[in-house]
Amino acid sequence: MKFMQNICPSISLIGLGYVGLPLARLFSMKYKVIGFDLNEKRVEELNGGIDTTKEVDPQLLKEAIECQGLSFTADSEDIRDCNVYIIAVPT
């Protein structure tokens, strides 16, 4: 992984369900993370610190948004410049 030593990855986590959201929160502890989901209402709620599915503790979610650089979007242009993409959608 020597080629990644001088790169600070920005991660896009695609799919913010029961796998994607907790994973996005965990990665945000060390990296900039943009969570992507097609459900605009869900994205709006998450940006407000509200997880109606209760997959992530509300306090941990708010800390990740306010202090750790976690953000959410439904616009694919917002994740265009990420250099790591993790897909967590139903198959």
Question: Where on the chain are the PLM-derived regions?
Answer:
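Structural/interface elements that position substrates and couple domains in central-metabolism enzymes
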Residues: 1-91
